[in-house]
Amino acid sequence: DAGLAEHLRPGALFVVGTEAILPQQVVHRLGTRLHAAWACLAGVPRYVLATRDKVYPRELLPHFAVPMLPVTELLRQPPAGLQAEARAFDLTPHSLWTEIFVGGAPAALAVQKGDHRLARGLLQLVP
């Protein structure tokens, strides 16, 4: 991962996908936030490209949680009593990104238009 910083030169772009787009944050695989911060420090433009199903409905925010992986994801045979934070995802503020695109449009426009129809199916799962 540290080698990525050497590619953050003038003229480079940092482009990633996402697991979900929350109102204030973007959800990524662990490590993406650090890489985005490096790109920001290097002055490299940073973009998120997402499909419409990645916009998380506001109504479901109380049910959102960053999943934690079991400690066995870090060690095959962890010592008894070992506690470790094994997050699966990072949360990155929208402000760190040059632009977030959803279905080819800026995220703010996509959200305003309600352009996240696949994610709406999640609402049926909440009592």
Where are these regions (language model features)?
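Conserved phosphate- and dinucleotide-binding cores of soluble alpha/beta proteins
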Residues: D1-P127
